[in-house]
Amino acid sequence: MPTETVAESLGRKYGGGPAAGQQMVDKMEAVAAEEGLLFRLGEAQHVGTVDAHRLLHLALAESTATQVALKEELLAAYFVRAENVADHDVLRAAAATVGLDAGRVEEVLGSQEYADAMEADIRQAAAYGATGVPFFVVDGRYGISGAQPPGTFAQVLTQAWDDTHPRLQMVGGTDEACGPDGCAI
């Protein structure tokens, strides 16, 4: 299957052809630049990420920190360096960067190991209502679809915290309680 650029893929998926897709790419690159990030989506190819996601499960088997590091490396490879994250050489290099065992990486890439876990992730995302990426889930109860402003994330994180850490509700008055100045009974 021939690869297509991100702009071509977006134009096909959302309509308007490559020109409309390129406008979307330009906007994403501009938003990233406002945050001090250099995205090279205009050079990136739209590729499948099944093997990358399976390696993320391998990394999680080692530790959450390793999975986070691999995710960051894969995102940088794709968005910043415009690398093909379906290419096994790119995946091997990313895995090596975060210290994953090369033998285990080869075993996963040469098999379907973690395919079931990845499929479970897809089913869970569908159950959450995710229809695209990015999609963020906070505390298993709040979903944030797409690139949203920081205030949206702050609001959701605050709400999730408040939901799980309710404030004490005072019942009755404080007239018959003792305080730092003595008792008012």
Located regions from the model:
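Structural alpha/beta surface segment adjacent to cysteine/selenocysteine redox centers
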Residues: 1-79, 183
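C-terminal cap of thioredoxin/glutaredoxin-like
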Residues: 57, 61-185
